[in-house]
Amino acid sequence: MSLHLSNVILHQLCKNDQDELVVKLRPASLENDTSTENLVAELHRVFHSKAGKGFGSFQSDSEFQFWLQEMRKGERDFYDFSQISANRLKEELIKYPFADEGILVFAEYQSLATDYLFIGILPMNQSLKVTEGLDIDATDYLDITKMDIAARIDLSSYDTDRESNRYLSYIKGRVGRKVADFFLDFLQADVGLDTKQQNQVLMQAVEDFCADSKLEKQEANEYKKQVYNYCNEQIKSGDEVQISELSGELPPSQDGTSFMDFTKEQGYELEESFPGDRSTVRKLTKYVGAGGGLNISFDSLLLGERIFYDPETDTLTIKGTPPNLKDQLSRN
């Protein structure tokens, strides 16, 4: 990939003899060479591919934002910025139960004509290597694919549009780890773009467009499948759902109204682009539900053909069970 590296530095988060988390600061930035460029390129790729990211923007009195502005103006060098930010990050991190040890990386770079600042904690793991004497020895390595404490600032968007609610993005982390809260506190930022809500609004707009266009059931299912296929491809490639691009792939209504025009005319508050949410868009082609010991999922086109729902009795009737399920049932 095309990546231009401006600055990168590593610091270390580790426990001292009192089991307290401390920062071991590197005395200078790393050299910009093939190894550091490859590291940052991999960090960019892995972060870009992570699903379920959160978005936000700085609070007006954010100290971190003030330091960042100083660096962008040349009033504070990158090393000093990384040092003061690393200490602030450590002070916030110790407030949380996931105060992990690891390698703290700050990287300023450009990719595809966009400037970024990346901040992340990379877990260290051990593996085995074969020495020149053909012996087996232990070796440490950065487990980049497992990182779940990372944030990235789109500096180009930040410089041109301070009112944006999404120039800051962060990995939300595993359930129960409150990584989102940590990064918002560390960066002194507020939650911005709600990607889940944007996906839900898109799904409602698709439903309403099909109803407003008076599409037959099969036509509506085909329309929803097209939307799902587009969104799913965007998710798999790590790209965002572009409403104008999606609209261009969909047939207009009978009166010639495009999907994009429909969303604007009806007042759906959709961003021009946003990350797709796999669990939400899946509901375009499937009915999914779980609870009370049941976990049910079936293609939407089966409703009314092999699967019937009676709302009065709250009963779901399935005609023709899958062979493997039928086999299990017949043995009991």
Curated annotation (Swiss-Prot):
UniProt key word rRNA-binding: no
Domain of life per record: Bacteria
Keyword Cytoplasm on entry: yes
Gene Ontology terms, MF aspect: double-stranded DNA binding; single-stranded RNA binding
Annotated compartments: Cytoplasm, Nucleoid
Classification via Pfam families: NA37
Annotated keywords: Cytoplasm
One GO cellular component term: cytoplasm
Family: Belongs to the YejK family.
Name of this chain's protein: Nucleoid-associated protein VIBHAR_03026
Species in which this protein is naturally found: Vibrio campbellii (strain ATCC BAA-1116)
